[in-house]
Amino acid sequence: MYQTKRPLLQSKREGILLTIEEEKMTDEQYTQAESFWTRKDETEKKLDADALYSWIDEFLSSHKVLALATATKDFIRCTPLEYSWYNGALWIFTEGGLKFKALKENKHIAAAVFETSASFGGLRSLQIEGTVEPVELFSDEYKNVAEFRKIPMEALKKLKEPMWLLKIIPIEITCLNSDFKKDGFGSRQIWKRCHS
């Protein structure tokens, strides 16, 4: 049963007192909520791995913006960014920002790409877990991605501040697509990178 709100955390950041309150749940309720999808997945029909990856490829190729979450032990950041899906990785050109504070310590990330106009029962989204590799400025890999994005190298070299390039390598992608049900599959499917 839910109890009344109580302060969970108070901290001062930049002179502002922050108070986070929590609806009290029991450990059992947290476990029940946490395991919802894994319990449901046990009985759902799975898509063939190649068919699932094909859907992922098409979905990522047809979208341009993701929400990138980076974190350390005591810092989190979620940033909307433009990306390109190219050669099995997500590529992000970025001027910088606080996401690098977390990336300096922790190269593990989460990202979400989703339909913004989804109706109830018509969801389509990806939750991505992976790692980030900062790409060396003006390396061959950097040049290849700039060419793919049709960004002139001369323009990138003339910038006052560098345009950094992040390479996100997906390790696991959770797909949610209500349309999978029409073909007899579960609406939630999970793709995992095979390690050799």
Language-model regions: role of each:
Residues 8, 16-17:
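Short, positively charged and aromatic/hydrophobic N-terminal segments
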Residues 11:
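Cationic, low-complexity basic patches in intrinsically disordered or flexible, solvent-exposed regions
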Residues 19-47, 123-196:
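Charged, gly/pro-rich active-site loop segments
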Residues 45-65:
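Short, basic/aromatic recognition patches
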Residues 63-96, 103, 111-115, 124:
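Short beta-strand segments
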Residues 89-90, 108, 131, 172:
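Structural motif
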Residues 98-101, 181-183:
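Short, surface-exposed beta-strand-loop junctions and turns on beta-sheet-rich folds
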